[in-house]
Amino acid sequence: MSTICAISTPYGSGGIAIVRVSGESAIQIVDSLFQGRKSLMEAGAYTIHYGELIKPVDDEVLDQVLVSIFRAPHSFTGEDVLEIACHGSLYIQQTLLQWLVDAGCQLAKAGEFT
């Protein structure tokens, strides 16, 4: 099964946007872009972690975020799910999606999260 990602908040700019990632590699993929106090791989279920999204290639910082972790099978999709709460500019949302795709996610199709 593939790991998917999508913006969960309505289209457009807002104060906060939520990007959801689901699948067997979700935690590894988000952890590869996240720098916080501890690795997301070591984090427990139903926890929230503050940190920065950093592009591994050149250490570019995109945003300060909160990442919520919901581990399988007790999540909305039954798989590992992470919700990334980032600032809501379209640039940040689209760049984050591109970074996730570059790291191994596929863009979710309409209805895949529901």
Predicted feature locations:
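A glycine-rich (often HGG/GG-containing) alpha/beta subdomain
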Residues: 1-114
